[in-house]
């Protein structure tokens, strides 16, 4: 019997390395885990592909999907809308595939309200100075935007207590190992093993 997949919520302030960690985790395209592809109204960045990185839609289309209750969660972030397809998530989990939601604390609260068993992971930078250095090093944003993101980061980081696990991304390889350890631990819980090893357990206990 295939165990139902786990839903992992991964959140972090911009620049903490969340997207890089998820990308490294899924680099070899494992069959038993995938990241959810969100809908968004923001413009594509260079190199982003529609349907692979995001489903890019306009505001009118996004609001229509809200009315249809199509989203597992949705939020407005930095003036843009982001949402996660309810149908896609449920279908993927029933196939025994772990799903990663790359969302902020607002979306995390919505998901937890609907699916309390979802596992929350919050990624923190080692310091504010390091976070600002990473944001500046991207070379993508103006100083005004960086200042805005730093201010927003303080608000976002105040929600770390709402998550089940906390990873400090000081050393990338260590943080990645921590994330993998969390995933492994969730696959070994009693509930997961009962589903995955049902036939074996029945044979072991057969009188």
From Swiss-Prot:
PROSITE patterns according to UniProt: GUANYLATE_KINASE_1, GUANYLATE_KINASE_2
Binding-site residues, ATP: 12-19
Enzyme class, UniProt record, top EC level: transferase
Keyword line: ATP-binding, Cytoplasm, Kinase, Nucleotide-binding, Transferase
Record localization: Cytoplasm
Recorded GO MF terms: ATP binding; guanylate kinase activity
Highest taxon, organism lineage: Bacteria
Catalytic activity annotation: GMP + ATP = GDP + ADP
Principal localisation: cytoplasm
Presence of keyword NADP: no
EC number(s) stated in the UniProt entry for this protein: 2.7.4.8
Domain Guanylate kinase-like: 5-184
Gene3D superfamilies linked to this entry: Guanylate Kinase phosphate binding domain, P-loop containing nucleotide triphosphate hydrolases
GO cellular component terms attached to this protein's record: cytosol
InterPro entries reported for this sequence: GK/Ca_channel_bsu, Guanylate_kin-like_dom, Guanylate_kinase, Guanylate_kinase_CS, P-loop_NTPase
UniProt similarity note: Belongs to the guanylate kinase family.
Functional description taken from the UniProt entry: Essential for recycling GMP and indirectly, cGMP.
Name by which UniProt lists this protein: Guanylate kinase
UniProt source species: Shewanella sp. (strain MR-7)
Source organism phylogeny: Bacteria, Pseudomonadati, Pseudomonadota, Gammaproteobacteria, Alteromonadales
Name of the gene: gmk
């Amino acid at each position: 019997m295939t165990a139902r997949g786990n839903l992992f919520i991964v959140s972090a302030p911009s620049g903490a390395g969340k997207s890089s960690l998820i990308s490294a985790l899924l680099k070899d395209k494992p069959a038993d885990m995938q990241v959810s592809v969100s809908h968004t109204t923001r413009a594509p960045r260079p190199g982003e592909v529609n349907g692979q990185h995001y489903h890019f839609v306009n505001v009118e289309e996004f609001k229509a999907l809200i009315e249809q209750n199509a989203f597992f969660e949705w939020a407005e972030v930095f003036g843009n809308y982001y949402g996660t397809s309810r149908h896609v998530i449920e279908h993927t989990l029933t196939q025994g595939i772990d799903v990663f939601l790359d969302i902020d604390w607002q979306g995390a609260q919505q998901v937890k309200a609907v699916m309390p068993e979802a596992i929350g992971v919050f990624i923190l930078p080692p310091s504010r100075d390091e976070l600002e250095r990473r944001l500046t090093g991207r070379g993508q944003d103006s100083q005004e935007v960086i200042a805005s993101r730093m201010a927003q980061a303080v608000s976002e980081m105040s929600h770390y207590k709402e998550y089940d696990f906390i990873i400090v991304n000081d050393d990338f390889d260590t943080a990645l190992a921590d994330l993998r350890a969390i995933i492994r631990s969730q696959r070994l819980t009693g509930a997961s093993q009962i589903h995955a090893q049902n036939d074996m357990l029945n044979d072991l206990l057969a009188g």
